[in-house]
Regions:
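Structural beta-strand/beta-sheet cores of well-ordered domains, especially the beta-sheet scaffolds
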Residues: 7, 18-20, 52-54, 83, ...
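Short C-terminal domain-edge/linker segments immediately following a structured domain
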Residues: 37-39, 85-91, 116, 138-141
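Short, small-residue-biased leader/transition segments that mark boundaries at the very start
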Residues: 1-6
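Active-site "cap" helix and flanking loop/linker of ATP-utilizing ligase/carboxylase catalytic domains
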Residues: 12-82, 93
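Generic beta-strand/beta-sheet core signal
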Residues: 57-59, 88, 111
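Generic C-terminus detector
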Residues: 94, 100-152
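RNase H-like, Mg2+-dependent phosphodiesterase core
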Residues: 71-89, 108, 116, 122
Length: 152
């Protein structure tokens, strides 16, 4: 970037927008960041899994207002193996139980042979997890699935 303007690059690996892609990225993320810092990114094989990935955020109600915190989260150990759960708003309580600490708490992600398949697998991960004030959207991926179906 050759300019007198200052640009802020704000990128967080824990943002829900990045988590489905984190499943697809096969290269070591530390190596990628180090290479980017050193200006040698072209030397890294940033292999991507070509399959689609879908991520469903699980939040604490009444997100985005002040969410309820402290609910014990159940079912993390029963999530299907083909789904991955990213933690964002969790902690361990005094008894070692995973609790919701507010806002966007978890993101259940999955890869699939199609967007519809990835969506089904991600929602299977969501279905395994529960806590008292949990909520999630049930329409994640619908636009991409409609495009996929229209394409044949």
């Amino acid at each position: 970037i050759c300019s007198s303007d200052v640009i802020l690059f704000y990128f967080l690996f824990y943002d829900p927008e990045t988590q489905p892609d984190r499943q697809r990225q096969q290269a070591d993320r530390v190596d990628l960041v180090d290479a980017a810092i050193d200006g040698k990114l072209e030397r890294i094989d940033a292999h991507w899994d070509p399959r689609p990935s879908v991520g469903v955020v699980m939040a604490s109600a009444p997100y985005p207002e002040t969410p309820v915190t402290g609910d014990v989260i159940y079912g993390l150990d029963t999530v299907p193996a083909d789904a991955k759960v990213f933690h964002a708003g969790t902690a361990l309580d005094a008894h070692g139980q995973v609790i919701a600490t507010g806002g966007r708490v978890l993101c259940a992600c999955a890869l699939g042979d199609s967007v519809a398949d990835a969506q089904q697998r991600a929602y299977a991960g969501v279905a395994a997890i529960h806590w008292t004030h949990e909520f999630h959207r049930s329409d994640i991926g619908w636009r991409a699935i409609a495009l996929e179906r229209a394409a044949g």
